């Protein structure tokens, strides 16, 4: 599967700590956005939060063959870029239990006293009912989660059950409040790759087991959402509800599916969230993750693990796990 975008995409690099710079990437090279369009913001987060104002300019740049030629002749190798998240310090919404295969896998893993065929029939019926009359299950997590992909993930001493979740991330470009389904895509700026890192052991609490999942404790730690490196404008992406998605751990495929396995698609998720709270430019919506969590394999992230996520047309994300946060690597 070829994950690389056919056309240029945007990204954010840090030429020095704390100084994000928007760049245009094509293949394995990039140029600074300011070299192509000096009037545009040099910070990709600022640009995305004013997407209505700059969308047409961005479209002209990423759609131009002149951009491709400029990057080919004058671009810098991506090997020399420290990539930050395309957008930072923003609300992050996460769809929970949104892939049919993952829900089936979880049910089979935990229903050891029931024949597998009976489990499959029950789960299939439940999913059909939920799709027909239910709604996406959304968790609002921390605003400091988004992190770049170049810096290793520091593994806290208590993060013994840190799990991976490869996800299609939708980045909002316009304010959305109580949108009908037919208008949902009009507020999408574009797409990126997310790894919705989750402390699996913190999801359910022993002190209040009846209250359900504690998504703040399990998902909200700063830097727990590797995002990017690429941002692909919606006009340059193919159908978000039918993209190949894959995660490798140390070269071994752990997750592999298509976004068509989502129970609720991008339109459903955006419209649903907007009925409950306004979505704002720069907000990140993670759309769920396919089967193949570490909890299924009985194996969580360890120091020096390497993850690679690919989503069709959105590129690849590579991240490495360091050791404890108070150690260098």
Residue ranges and their predicted role:
Residues 161, 278, 300-301:
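Residue-level "contact hotspot" at macromolecular interaction interfaces
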Residues 88, 94, 280, 302-303:
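Residue-level recognition of short, solvent-exposed, well-ordered loop/turn junctions
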Residues 21-62:
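N-terminal cap/recognition module
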Residues 229, 253-279, 294:
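Glycine-rich active-site loops that engage anionic ligands at enzyme catalytic sites
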Residues 2-37, 222, 229, 291-329:
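Charged, cofactor-coupling segments
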Residues 147-149, 279-296, 309-312:
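Conserved metal-binding segment of the jelly-roll/cupin
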Residues 2-13, 45-249:
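Active-site microenvironments in enzyme catalytic cores
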């Amino acid at each position: 599967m070829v994950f690389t975008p056919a056309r240029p995409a945007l990204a954010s690099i840090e030429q020095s700590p704390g100084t994000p710079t928007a760049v245009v990437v094509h293949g394995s090279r990039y140029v600074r956005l300011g070299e192509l369009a000096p009037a545009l913001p040099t910070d990709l987060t600022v640009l995305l939060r004013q997407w209505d104002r700059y969308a047409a300019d961005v479209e002209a740049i990423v759609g131009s063959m002149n951009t491709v030629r400029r990057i080919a002749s004058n671009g810098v190798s991506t090997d020399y870029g420290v990539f930050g998240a395309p957008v930072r310090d923003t609300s992050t919404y996460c769809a929970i239990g949104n892939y049919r295969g993952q829900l089936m896998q979880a049910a089979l893993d935990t229903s050891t006293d029931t024949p597998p065929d009976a489990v499959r029939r029950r789960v299939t019926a439940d999913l059909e009912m939920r799709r027909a009359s239910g709604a996406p299950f959304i968790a609002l997590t921390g605003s400091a989660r988004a992190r770049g992909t170049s810096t290793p993930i520091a593994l806290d001493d208590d993060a013994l059950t840190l799990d991976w979740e490869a996800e299609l991330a939708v980045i909002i470009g316009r304010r959305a409040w109580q949108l009908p389904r037919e208008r949902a895509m009009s507020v999408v700026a574009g797409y990126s790759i997310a790894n919705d890192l989750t402390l699996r052991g913190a999801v359910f609490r022993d002190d209040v087991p009846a209250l359900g999942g504690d998504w703040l404790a399990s998902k909200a730690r700063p830097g727990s959402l590797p995002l990017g490196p690429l941002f692909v404008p919606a006009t340059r992406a193919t159908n978000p509800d039918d993209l190949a998605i894959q995660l490798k751990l140390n070269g071994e495929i752990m997750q592999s599916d298509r976004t068509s396995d989502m129970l609720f698609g991008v339109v459903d998720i955006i419209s649903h969230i907007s009925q409950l709270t306004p979505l704002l430019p720069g907000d990140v919506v993670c759309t769920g993750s396919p089967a193949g969590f570490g909890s299924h394999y009985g194996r969580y992230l360890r120091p020096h693990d390497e993850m690679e996520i690919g989503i069709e047309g959105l590129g690849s994300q590579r991240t490495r796990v360091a050791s404890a946060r108070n150690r260098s690597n």
